[in-house]
A protein has these predicted regions:
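Active-site nucleophile-adjacent alpha helix/oxyanion-hole segment immediately C-terminal to the catalytic cysteine
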Residues: 1-51
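Conserved active-site-adjacent core of cysteine acyl-enzyme catalytic domains
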Residues: 44-172
């Protein structure tokens, strides 16, 4: 059994799974990190030239302009918080590789594509174990729906039983 002590933040707005995952990863490796979802979203809005003054503050994450509630790239968000460690892989990881990373204390950040797309969602895998019968399970931290445990193959192909497919992996 391999498990990381990891605290996933609840996403503060409907499209901020990318912000919640990136900030949670930053705080996992540096508990004193000053990153928060609003600060990261403000940086995103400035970079994407959304013409907004800001996306709230760390102390007041509600009441942000609607333009701030945007889907965005986890790769860019992880790079902004200085947590991206290499090039993302356009595929899921094997159970063995997932376990290896978790044993090394590294959460596995994944992009889930819903059905045939284009909607996607970001989560982190923070644990894995194998039963006596050989079933391989993973613990998933989801900034929208919370913690859950999935058979590795089921998570790869049918997350949330909604045709959610693990399509990209981000090294942190």
């Amino acid at each position: 059994m391999a498990v990381i002590k990891f605290q996933m933040q609840q996403q503060q707005h409907s499209n901020w799974c990318w912000a919640a995952v990136a900030v949670s990863v930053a705080r996992h490796f540096d508990p004193d990190s000053t990153w928060c979802q609003c600060r990261l979203a403000s940086r995103m809005a400035k970079r994407e030239k959304l013409n907004v003054a800001g996306c709230g503050t760390c102390r007041k994450p509600t009441g942000v302009p609607k333009k701030c509630n945007q889907p965005w790239y986890l790769q860019k968000a992880l790079r902004m918080v200085k947590m991206l460690k290499g090039k993302p892989k356009g595929a899921p990881l094997s159970y063995r590789k997932t376990r290896q990373l978790i044993k090394a204390g590294r959460p596995v950040c994944a992009r889930i594509l819903w059905g045939r797309g284009p909607d996607a969602h970001f989560v982190a895998i923070t644990g894995c174990f194998k039963t006596k019968s050989g079933e391989r399970w993973v613990d998933v931290e989801d900034p929208d729906s919370g913690s859950s445990t999935w058979l590795h193959e089921e998570f790869r192909k049918n997350y949330e039983y909604a045709q959610g497919q693990w399509v990209d992996t981000y090294p942190v």
